[in-house]
């Protein structure tokens, strides 16, 4: 078919060179370097050397920077991420630090609560030397005021992500960031103490590109109402912020909102606020966690109008204001639902049967802390949820019969987590191995025995995310260093305690499931 006659392949020049220079043939004396001190990296381009550095850990990169002046220069010019222990004593060293690291685009400044942080003057120097910053984190920088934030914003106009925690500046500093950083996309504020009662409202310019807002443990956080109501915003997450938030969500407009994700946790919001959220016709993800004033009526108003809802998390906090009535509305209107988490919600056979029958795209389901869910309800799910892939059940009145029903039904089920269900015995594990060899199962004794998941499952499903991070030290692309062994031990303790917390376990499980699916789809 027109092919040339076969002939012996010519040796590859690259393979030949590698063979000639391999360690077993290399002899420094034969090539004229009797002392053996020849630098074989001298002929490597700087870009190639920098690429090699990217595969090293933070500690190895620091040690490599001491090898030669060239390595020091290459390492400094190619570190784009830097984390500093932002104590006040760092001020005289800032010029030297940024002379070496002159290409930083992601900067973290962290100070522990027992020390004085860097001041407005130091932050101004940082903004002058790192004008190309796109991501900044401020943690515990209590000496920075509104004036410091304003000067920083004027010099760092390319900033895209800003995260501040345990700082004392107020609304003026935040407004300055929003005014000068026109391309800011993500704003995260935690424990900002400068938002007093007379604080000026947060203003967003018409040309702003803000896409995500995260507010946590704020006093008078309602001053951010204009941000929540802006039409460009995609994601809102509000956790443990004081005051009533109904008015904020009422400002969402008449269906012109672009919000696709809303997460509310331990917040004073009622059905009035949910009525406002229902105006977000593009909403795809809704988390209602420990909001005791929300009822079936508010939930029904959201699901009736938000036809694109794909992920729904409800933590009823055992106040029993959300039950079958609200879940029946979910079954009727949320036909695109893919992920459902019910914690402390007394769902019955009627509502679960309706959800299993109508929500044909449901892939991830978690039922926790309910006294009304037994073998009959699980059997109904097993029979009707033909697309279910991952299922987590915790603290419910099911037995081996319900677990066996899941194995016999749900043909696409790949992961099953059963926790704190006292009527489920270990014998069902062996039964599952025989019937569903590919099914990944996690049960109570997996943690006590130190075993991850049955049949070689993914250990990441059992991991718990620790919110509080230990303060890091100077670091590079290899990751953020950690300073202070005491806080590291506290983080480990929180991780262990997190494995015993049902709600955190379920939230982590669903988060890992979603991430693994996103990775596999790519």
Swiss-Prot record:
<dbReference type="GO" id="GO:0004842">
    <property type="term" value="F:ubiquitin-protein transferase activity"/>
</dbReference>
<feature type="repeat" description="LRR 4">
    <location>
        <begin position="266"/>
        <end position="290"/>
    </location>
</feature>
<feature type="repeat" description="LRR 10">
    <location>
        <begin position="421"/>
        <end position="447"/>
    </location>
</feature>
<feature type="repeat" description="LRR 8">
    <location>
        <begin position="370"/>
        <end position="393"/>
    </location>
</feature>
<keyword id="KW-0677">Repeat</keyword>
<dbReference type="Pfam" id="PF24758">
    <property type="entry name" value="LRR_At5g56370"/>
</dbReference>
<feature type="repeat" description="LRR 3">
    <location>
        <begin position="169"/>
        <end position="191"/>
    </location>
</feature>
<protein>
    <recommendedName>
        <fullName>F-box/LRR-repeat protein 16</fullName>
    </recommendedName>
</protein>
<dbReference type="Pfam" id="PF00646">
    <property type="entry name" value="F-box"/>
</dbReference>
<dbReference type="InterPro" id="IPR055411">
    <property type="entry name" value="LRR_FXL15/At3g58940/PEG3-like"/>
</dbReference>
<feature type="repeat" description="LRR 1">
    <location>
        <begin position="115"/>
        <end position="140"/>
    </location>
</feature>
<feature type="repeat" description="LRR 6">
    <location>
        <begin position="319"/>
        <end position="344"/>
    </location>
</feature>
<feature type="repeat" description="LRR 5">
    <location>
        <begin position="291"/>
        <end position="316"/>
    </location>
</feature>
<dbReference type="GO" id="GO:0005737">
    <property type="term" value="C:cytoplasm"/>
</dbReference>
<keyword id="KW-0433">Leucine-rich repeat</keyword>
<dbReference type="InterPro" id="IPR006553">
    <property type="entry name" value="Leu-rich_rpt_Cys-con_subtyp"/>
</dbReference>
<feature type="domain" description="F-box">
    <location>
        <begin position="38"/>
        <end position="84"/>
    </location>
</feature>
<feature type="repeat" description="LRR 7">
    <location>
        <begin position="348"/>
        <end position="369"/>
    </location>
</feature>
<dbReference type="InterPro" id="IPR036047">
    <property type="entry name" value="F-box-like_dom_sf"/>
</dbReference>
<dbReference type="InterPro" id="IPR032675">
    <property type="entry name" value="LRR_dom_sf"/>
</dbReference>
<dbReference type="InterPro" id="IPR001810">
    <property type="entry name" value="F-box_dom"/>
</dbReference>
<feature type="repeat" description="LRR 9">
    <location>
        <begin position="395"/>
        <end position="420"/>
    </location>
</feature>
<feature type="repeat" description="LRR 2">
    <location>
        <begin position="141"/>
        <end position="166"/>
    </location>
</feature>
